[in-house]
Amino acid sequence: MELEYPDDLRYLDSHEYIRLDGEIATIGLSAHAIDELGDIVFLELPEEGDAIVVGETFGSIESVKAVEDLYAPISGTVIDRNEALIQSPEMVSEDPYEEGWFIKVRVDNLDDEMLAETMTAEEYRLQVAGEE
């Protein structure tokens, strides 16, 4: 099965994705990372109002295989978290990009340097192909 990597997202080396809509960023984990992790059993996410800092951990995801930290692709304030995933973390495996997002963040200061640390979908496809 070929995994999808939507073109409207930016990706990190650590496999998080970011979808920008003005000053609001939706953050989740790529289909590749979720496929590698296997069945997701627990998700730890920040609360609304919490600050996240680019490059630092903002939560963790636990599967039957491993526990992995989640890294912030941008800095900002959490304005929403996907409560449905807290109750049913396995949902992230079913649809990581639409229903399986983790948090929404009001971005502090988005600049080109910050986005330079991310990859396009095509660049990300090439990276994950090299990992296999």
UniProtKB/Swiss-Prot annotation:
- Give me the Gene Ontology terms describing cellular component: cytosol; glycine cleavage complex
Report the PROSITE patterns cross-referenced here. BIOTINYL_LIPOYL, LIPOYL
Provide the alphabetized UniProt keywords: Lipoyl
Q: Which residues carry this modification: N6-lipoyllysine?
A: 65
Looking up Pfam families in the UniProt record yields: GCV_H
Q: Does the keyword rRNA processing apply?
A: no
The record's listing under InterPro entries reads: 2-oxoA_DH_lipoyl-BS, Biotin_lipoyl, GCV_H, GCV_H/Fam206, GCV_H_sub, Single_hybrid_motif
What does the entry's cofactor note say about binding and number? Answer: Binds 1 lipoyl cofactor covalently.
Residues forming the Lipoyl-binding domain are 24-106
Coiled-coil region(s) at which residues?
A: none
Stated family: Belongs to the GcvH family.
Q: How does it assemble?
A: The glycine cleavage system is composed of four proteins: P, T, L and H.
Q: What is this protein called?
A: Glycine cleavage system H protein
- Native organism: Picosynechococcus sp. (strain ATCC 27264 / PCC 7002 / PR-6)
